[in-house]
């Protein structure tokens, strides 16, 4: 950084804010086998072993004055990731399948940076899926049921780090799960028309989410308090997502209408839909929301493809996309970081004279974009 118009604090041009030495070792090996036992019935087995090693050293002076802890890690993770499944073609148009898989995810660099006071754990996922599929020349459809059980799932906390990135943590997520049903269908009754639709309905929960806070007792001493909130909604996990696409085409021209519905989302994992903002005198000022509301949007794309063989090119496509044609006002992201504690005998999410412990990212209103692509 060489220049800042209005620095908020003492500014040092060309200061080296950060230096870090890090090594990551990633080794994996796998065995895969598949067998068809009889016509239409097959099974498969995938076995993977993976080793991940982290070595990070940081002199702890990457902020002026050494006000932040440096990044240091000496971690090794060994993962065994099996997957087994079965597939059966009942007849020409109908098939069913089932699978079980286990996978692991190591913490990434941002996790070390945002959770430097914790000993980070790897995420473990066990996934069971069962599905059915129908397919014909003009129509195809499928249904998939899944249950995903997590240990130490990395979930977004709703908080931001010092550069505005979302913080993910598994310090208190413990056991959690995601379960639901996925549906999709495609219908093409004529060469000039196609209809695609898919939907996902899910339940996403943390089993025993915990929070902690500090209180001052009658003697003026700081006392650590905590609470187990039990089963709570997983943050940023809508329980309904529906997409619908109509496609019209004639010779080189095409038109596509895309609609999407996304259900409401929690900004934290605590199940609080709002926090209470108190004035300095202890009176209630207002409630500040900590939810992303559901929304429905529609986009339209128009395009035309034409050949360019006469000038030595394959073809070109010119198009224009109109986004959010109904000018829907909605937020597609946000953050929330209130305090927690007992207020009038009730566990409360709150702040004192601070309306900015929750924020939202509004999406663009109606807008459009033109494009041109050329294939050589």
Question: Which residues make up each language-model segment?
Answer:
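Signature of Gram-negative outer-membrane beta-barrel scaffolds
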Residues: 1-91, 106, 211
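Residue-level signature of outer-membrane beta-barrel architecture
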Residues: 25, 31-36, 78, 86-90, ...
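Membrane-embedded beta-barrel scaffold of Gram-negative outer-membrane proteins
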Residues: 89, 93-101, 121-179, 184-188, ...
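Conserved C-terminal beta-signal and adjacent last beta-strands/turns
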Residues: 98, 194, 231-376
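Gram-negative outer-membrane beta-barrel transporters
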Residues: 147-149, 169-274, 373-375
């Amino acid at each position: 950084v060489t220049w800042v118009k209005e620095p908020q604090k003492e500014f040092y041009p060309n200061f080296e804010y950060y230096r870090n030495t890090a090594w990551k070792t990633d080794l994996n090996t796998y065995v895969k086998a598949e067998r068809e036992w009889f016509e239409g019935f097959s099974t498969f087995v995938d076995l993977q072993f993976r080793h991940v090693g982290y070595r990070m050293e940081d002199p702890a002076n990457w902020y002026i004055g050494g006000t932040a802890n440096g990044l240091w890690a000496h971690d090794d993770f060994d993962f065994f990731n099996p997957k087994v499944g079965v597939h059966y073609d009942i007849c020409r148009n109908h098939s069913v399948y089932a699978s079980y898989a286990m996978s692991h995810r190591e913490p990434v660099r941002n996790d070390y940076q945002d959770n430097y006071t914790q000993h980070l754990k790897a995420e473990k996922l066990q996934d069971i899926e069962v599905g059915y599929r129908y397919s014909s020349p003009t129509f195809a459809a499928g249904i998939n049921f899944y249950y995903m059980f997590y240990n130490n799932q990395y979930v977004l906390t709703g908080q931001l780090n010092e550069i505005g990135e979302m913080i993910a943590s598994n310090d208190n997520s413990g056991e959690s799960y995601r379960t639901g049903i996925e549906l999709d269908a495609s219908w093409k009754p004529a060469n000039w028309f196609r209809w695609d639709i898919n939907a996902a309905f899910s339940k996403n929960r943390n089993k025993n989410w915990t929070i902690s806070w500090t209180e001052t007792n009658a003697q003026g001493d700081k006392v650590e308090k905590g609470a187990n909130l039990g089963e709570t909604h997983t943050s940023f996990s809508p329980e309904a997502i529906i997409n619908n696409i109509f496609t019209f085409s004639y010779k080189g021209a095409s038109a596509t209408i895309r609609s999407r519905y996304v259900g409401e989302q929690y900004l934290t994992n605590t199940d609080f839909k709002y926090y209470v903002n108190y004035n300095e005198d202890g009176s209630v000022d207002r409630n500040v929301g900590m939810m992303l509301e559901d929304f429905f949007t529609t986009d339209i794309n128009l395009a035309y493809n034409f050949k360019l063989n006469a000038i030595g090119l394959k073809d070109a496509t010119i198009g224009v996309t109109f986004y959010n044609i109904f000018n829907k006002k909605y937020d597609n992201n946000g953050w929330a970081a209130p305090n927690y504690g007992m207020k009038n005998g009730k566990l409360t999410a709150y702040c004192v004279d601070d309306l900015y412990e929750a924020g939202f990212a509004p999406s663009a209103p109606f807008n459009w974009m033109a494009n041109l692509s050329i294939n050589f």
